[in-house]
């Protein structure tokens, strides 16, 4: 069965045609927006998509290490290590990264939303944000199962520490909040410290 996410990206992405002195050039819409320093996380967080986002972040830093990057997130979450590769790159590069939730930012999506530049983490009014502890499954010998259980516990502790860093909440508050699926409105996410503000309308550009 065809992956619906792959089908969307390969078949339904619109093309943008631009005129220049050299003639016409066609871009897919995401490549065109990348020129404006806009990156998207759409769908599950997984290795291939995470590698593309990391590459885009590094490319934009190489182009201009001081200019802001806008990171739009609409994701149900996914693989923790894939999400952490994006998170670490966001913290590593010199560019400030503005995050904006459109639709949903759940699980690793919410962590990446919170990881944006302080004061520049946003959500649209009807966005939904969800936080929870990591989950996983493993089959094998009893000793190996225990090893994987310890690894999940270590990841849980590390993720809690990251949420503490970016929300300003104490560890126990984060631990309790992430014990079960915890769904939030944009207002609740702002109160919790995952975002800084809710955007209802794009601000008018400053007068020249």
From Swiss-Prot:
* Entry annotation: catalytic residues: 107, 132
Q: Name one Pfam family in it.
A: CLP_protease
**Where does the record say this protein resides?**
Cytoplasm
Superkingdom classification of source: Bacteria
Its BP terms in the Gene Ontology are: protein quality control for misfolded or incompletely synthesized proteins
Q: Is Transferase tagged as a keyword?
A: no
Catalysis: reaction(s) = Hydrolysis of proteins to small peptides in the presence of ATP and magnesium. alpha-casein is the usual test substrate. In the absence of ATP, only oligopeptides shorter than five residues are hydrolyzed (such as succinyl-Leu-Tyr-|-NHMec, and Leu-Tyr-Leu-|-Tyr-Trp, in which cleavage of the -Tyr-|-Leu- and -Tyr-|-Trp bonds also occurs)
Q: What is its EC number?
A: 3.4.21.92
Which PROSITE patterns does UniProt cross-reference here? CLP_PROTEASE_HIS (PS00382), CLP_PROTEASE_SER (PS00381)
Classification via NCBIfam families? PRK00277.1, PRK12553.1
Q: How does it assemble?
A: Fourteen ClpP subunits assemble into 2 heptameric rings which stack back to back to give a disk-like structure with a central cavity, resembling the structure of eukaryotic proteasomes.
Describe the family membership recorded for this protein in Swiss-Prot or TrEMBL: Belongs to the peptidase S14 family.
What is this protein identified as? ATP-dependent Clp protease proteolytic subunit
């Amino acid at each position: 069965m065809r992956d619906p996410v792959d089908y969307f990206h390969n078949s339904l992405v619109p093309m943008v045609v631009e005129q220049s002195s050299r003639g016409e050039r066609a871009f897919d819409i995401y490549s065109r927006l990348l020129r404006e320093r806009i990156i998207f996380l759409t769908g599950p967080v997984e290795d291939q998509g995470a590698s593309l986002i990391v590459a885009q972040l590094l490319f934009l830093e190489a182009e201009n290490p001081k200019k802001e990057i806008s990171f739009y997130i609409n994701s149900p979450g996914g693989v923790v290590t894939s999400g952490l590769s994006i998170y670490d790159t966001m913290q590593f590069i010199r560019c400030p990264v503005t995050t904006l939730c459109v639709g949903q930012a759940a699980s690793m999506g919410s962590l990446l939303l919170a990881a944006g530049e302080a004061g520049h983490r946003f959500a649209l009014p009807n966005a939904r944000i969800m936080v929870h502890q990591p989950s996983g499954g493993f089959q094998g010998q009893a000793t190996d199962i225990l090893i994987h259980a310890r690894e999940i516990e270590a990841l849980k502790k590390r993720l809690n520490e990251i949420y503490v860093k970016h929300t300003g909440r104490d560890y126990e508050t984060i631990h309790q909040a992430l014990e079960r699926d915890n769904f939030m409105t944009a207002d609740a996410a702002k109160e919790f410290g995952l975002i800084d503000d809710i955007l209802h309308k794009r601000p008018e550009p400053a007068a020249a």
